[in-house]
Design a protein with these regions (language model features):
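Short, solvent-exposed coil/turn linker segments
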Residues: 11-13, 128-129, 145, 154, ...
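Flexible, solvent-exposed extracytoplasmic
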Residues: 78-80, 119-123, 162-165
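Structured core elements
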Residues: 114, 171-174, 259
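Helix-enriched interaction subdomains in cytosolic or periplasmic regions
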Residues: 109-142
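Hydrophobic transmembrane alpha-helices
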Residues: 238, 242-270
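A Trp-anchored, charged/polar loop motif used as the substrate-binding/catalytic surface
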Residues: 133-161
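Non-transmembrane functional regions of envelope-associated proteins
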Residues: 1-108, 166-250
Length: 270
């Protein structure tokens, strides 16, 4: 089985356990997903927001006080399946990196990494779920009404199955309906109107998965390079301000000469 279900950490339950006001049986923990018992492959879908409410970071894993375990986030849980790792495999902290298989993922802070967004909403290709379900054994409403089999999944000539579109791909199933309110503001926008920096949760996780697959990461700038950039910009600013100052002095001198000549003309009527 290569399926991962989305799960959540119940923050209220976790808080009660931390305060020792509740004792929840670990055996009943299903991470708010009724399908968890079918495979026990779960990924947490609770990314952290920054202070401005924008989502820029991703947690490789989250610790559950209920189960006393580290649980991989959704993107990492899917990659566990892709790389053939155990379901509960989590990234390991090592210096300034998280180690995940043979990947070295730069850390932003102790617990998170930065997401290198590939674009705004709609960057990753989408396929309607009904087009996947519509095989020779499933009747859609359109097929019933028209009396014709469409079978977009497995029709021989142009079906999605024979197209190879899903071969060796990581496929995420999620809602792209605004009514479901699974929208996250990110640091990347189309720039056409206010609020077009929103992407759906399924797209959010797709970005970190693609980052890891392609090794395309964002790193925090080192303190040394920050200092060099500050010194460089300071020197440039000083040079530009000095140059402008000299120009102003020259212009001022020319203005004074022009005024002196004008006064001479006025006095002597030249």
């Amino acid at each position: 089985r290569k399926v991962v279900v989305a799960g959540k950490i119940n923050e209220l339950t976790e808080q009660k356990i931390e305060e020792r006001t509740s004792w929840v049986g670990r055996i009943n923990e299903n991470y708010d997903n009724i399908f968890y018992s079918a495979d026990s492959s779960v990924g947490i879908v609770q990314p952290p927001a920054d202070y401005d409410g924008v989502y820029r970071r991703y947690l490789p894993y989250i610790q559950s006080d209920v189960t006393q375990k580290l649980v991989p986030s959704f993107g990492y849980a899917l990659l566990n399946k892709y790389y053939g790792l155990k379901n509960n495999t989590t990234a390991k902290r090592s210096g300034n990196y998280f180690l995940f298989g043979d990947k070295k993922i730069p850390r932003y802070d102790r617990f998170s990494t930065l997401i290198n967004f590939y674009g705004s909403s709609g960057t990753f290709p989408r396929v309607k779920l009904i087009d996947i379900l519509d095989d020779k054994n499933f009747k859609t409403i359109d097929e019933i009404n028209l009396g014709v089999d469409i079978n977009t999944w497995d029709v021989s000539d142009y079906g999605l199955l024979s197209s190879g579109r899903f071969k060796d791909k990581v496929v995420l199933i999620g809602s792209t309906m605004p009514e479901d309110r699974d929208l996250l503001p990110i640091s990347f926008a189309k720039g056409k109107q206010k609020g077009d920096n929103l992407i759906y949760g399924v797209e959010f996780h797709a970005n970190i998965i693609q980052n890891i697959l392609s090794g395309n990461f964002l790193s925090v700038q080192s303190k040394e390079s920050e200092l060099l950039v500050i010194l460089y910009l300071t020197a440039i600013s000083f040079y530009i301000s000095s140059f402008i100052r000299k120009i102003k002095l020259r212009i001022g001198f020319l203005v004074e000469v022009a005024n002196f000549i004008f006064v001479l003309f006025s006095i002597y009527g030249i």
